[in-house]
């Protein structure tokens, strides 16, 4: 015997509203203000791409804090280069300690072709013999 549906199909879209609103604001920025001021981000991916991915992966609260930290790092005396969204949220992050979601300081990531050797022997062609 199957229980009748109580009409809870509306919950998932409602829970996605904050995430979609944050991503919508980034979309609006990318299509209005960004073309006017120019594309001059110091990082790859750009700050707006980073913010969109962080909010998509982690939601508006955690992704928003990650994006804020990235924007503060993207300044003349800040970092530059490759700065990807983390695959997982930091283990020490809690909703009531939001600053722990983000990396507030950072170092420039090395280019992929001079990355540190992993010990697998595939990087031997990078060094001259």
Swiss-Prot record:
It comes from Rhodopseudomonas palustris (strain TIE-1). NCBIfam families: membrane protein insertion efficiency factor YidD. It comes from the Bacteria. It is found in: Cell inner membrane. Belongs to the UPF0161 family. It is a peripheral membrane protein. Disulfide bonds: none annotated. This is Putative membrane protein insertion efficiency factor. SMART domains: Haemolytic.
């Amino acid at each position: 015997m199957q229980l009748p549906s109580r009409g809870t199909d509306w919950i998932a879209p409602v829970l996605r509203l904050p995430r979609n609103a944050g991503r919508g604001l980034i979309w609006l920025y990318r299509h209005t203000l960004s073309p006017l001021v120019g594309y001059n981000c110091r990082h790859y991916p750009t700050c707006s791409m980073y913010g969109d991915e962080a909010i998509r992966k982690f939601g508006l609260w955690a992704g928003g804090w990650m994006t804020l930290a990235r924007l503060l790092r993207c300044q003349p005396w800040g970092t530059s280069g490759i700065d990807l969204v983390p695959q997982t949220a930091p283990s020490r992050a809690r909703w009531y300690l939001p600053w722990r979601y983000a990396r507030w300081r950072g170092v420039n990531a090395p280019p992929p072709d001079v990355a540190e050797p992993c010990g697998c022997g595939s990087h031997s062609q990078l060094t001259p013999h």
